[in-house]
Amino acid sequence: MHCMAVHQFSPSIVSSLPTISTYNNNHFCRFFTPKTSISPISKTKSKSSTCYPIQCTVVNNSSPSSTIVRRSANYEPPIWSFDYIQSLSTQYKGESYTRQLNKLKKEVKRMLLRMEINSLALLELIDTLQRLGISYHFKNEINTILKKKYNDNYINNNIITNPNYNNLYATALEFRLLRQHGYTVPQEIFNAFKDKRGKFKTSLSDDIMGVLCLYEASFYAMKHENILEEARIFSTKCLKKYMEKIENEEEKKILLLNDNNINSNLLLINHAFELPLHWRITRSEARWFIDEIYEKKQDMNSTLFEFAKLDFNIVQSTHQEDLQHLSRWWRDCKLGGKLNFARDRLMEAFLWDVGLKFEGEFSYFRRTNARLFVLITIIDDIYDVYGTLEELELFTSAVERWDVKLINELPDYMKMPFFVLHNTINEMGFDVLVEQNFVNIEYLKKSWVDLCKCYLQEAKWYYSGYQPTLEEYTELGWLSIGASVILMHAYFCFTNPITKQDLKSLQLQHHYPNIIKQACLITRLADDLGTSSDELNRGDVPKSIQCYMYDNNATEDEAREHIKFLISETWKDMNKKDEDESCLSENFVEVCKNMARTALFIYENGDGHGSQNSLSKERISTLIITPINIPK
């Protein structure tokens, strides 16, 4: 088990839901143009639903039996059985593979340390290590190199004498790597590539890899960094024109005379347009880069390639062990399959945790945190699909009072979920007690109280037919997505030891640091982009897309573009290191950012969590099940 921590939570959110002011009033308001406020009744709209009603009898000790017509989302049962998960096996275990990996690691380390500090090759090597998913092995070495480069170029003002000063590719690559590692490199470095009119030089379009690097670097922009905004617009236009040329056979022939990497370039550009590097999870990027790009590169290094493939497979074997441990827990708690109206998505829940923290040493975090994803999914479906308002109020009250004796006051179908939730959180609290001699049950519980109260408020919107504004929706939605529960648990895992300063800092931040709120908001908006149509068909409350359409009389396409804009703007907030992050561990901050990245990955092409489509199956297979082929 790794580091733990503590913090106190905000007051109850039932009567005073987390208002914009507890986050950053301007963060939400500046993006919304809601209509003049009108009463809930006048905003009521009829709800269309393709959900099928279920007629059933619910036994509740506090009331007579009654027949209730319920909704059903008709979720498919899980395709990954317990027996299949337990049968997963890989050869990449044992000391022989570990010895081989360590030998390759030493060779790569020597390669990294003997390079000239100002060489472009050193920057490219660091970038390659990151894209292959193996840079975590050389964290200290990379940090030392980048710190020296930053001090030499920006503290000692030697940037102009740097041999790569007028090289767009080298400048953009260095900028991205330094910003990624927390160095506030000034955006003005790109003024060297502008003409007398203050526009990026058109001749830069001839350096297509430099333009692609500029595009990737622009996603490290913070608010009001206009040069980086201009860089993104310029690079996007250049890259699109390049792609158009490739589609023209005559133009393509001309390009081939000067560049043999056109196919590779096209793959990289399309990949960047789907999601920029900064927004991607490490594990998925590593598998893609290994499978599709690196082996075909003219400068491919066989030692790096062998090391990356072996490391991927060894870590994957650890993930399989973690998954099997989780699967046994799920079987033993006997909740899976009991609630036929809810999503049973154990494998998908574990995929989230691979996105949050993939390194082999963090098994405890993955094994416990994935339980929360499973429980959030089940309880979300209780509130969204099945429960009556009266039952949901009972469940919310039971979570708030946190007394297992209250189980007899709940309907039968709620008893098992509440009991499993109660036991799971208490067990996690026990782990913290053993590790740090601190009782944190109240803090873990409070995150669930906040979540359930948000769920309840959304249920009230549904039953009253209320149409929230986008502002109202996001005030609630950043919490109701459930990511805050995950990140609170992560905070306890990655802050060790817990100090009084940690507690004081969190209290001053209204108990949810900005980086948590930012990550949760991106998760909510990404979820809405991927699932809102399906959820509306199931009869759920309007999501951010529909709220924006209602507020602004906009089309769905216009609303989707605005939600993407909100995601981009929220990333700018996350790119800026707040003062409140000073008390947060580096691992925890990275998990928060990885939450946003994983959400964008999961919902990139639809509902990758609830829907068991071919794409989600393929992703699970490549990341968790199928090792990379390594010829003997």
Curated annotation (Swiss-Prot):
UniProt record, GO biological process: diterpenoid biosynthetic process
Gene of this entry: TPS3FN
Keyword presence, Cytoplasm: no
Protein source organism: Cannabis sativa (Hemp)
Protein name: Myrcene synthase TPS3FN, chloroplastic
Enzyme Commission no: 4.2.3.15
Family: Belongs to the terpene synthase family. Tpsb subfamily.
Subcellular location: Plastid, Chloroplast
Co-factor note (free text): Binds 3 Mg(2+) or Mn(2+) ions per subunit.
Gene3D superfamilies on file: Farnesyl Diphosphate Synthase, Terpene synthase, N-terminal domain
Transit peptide location: 1-55
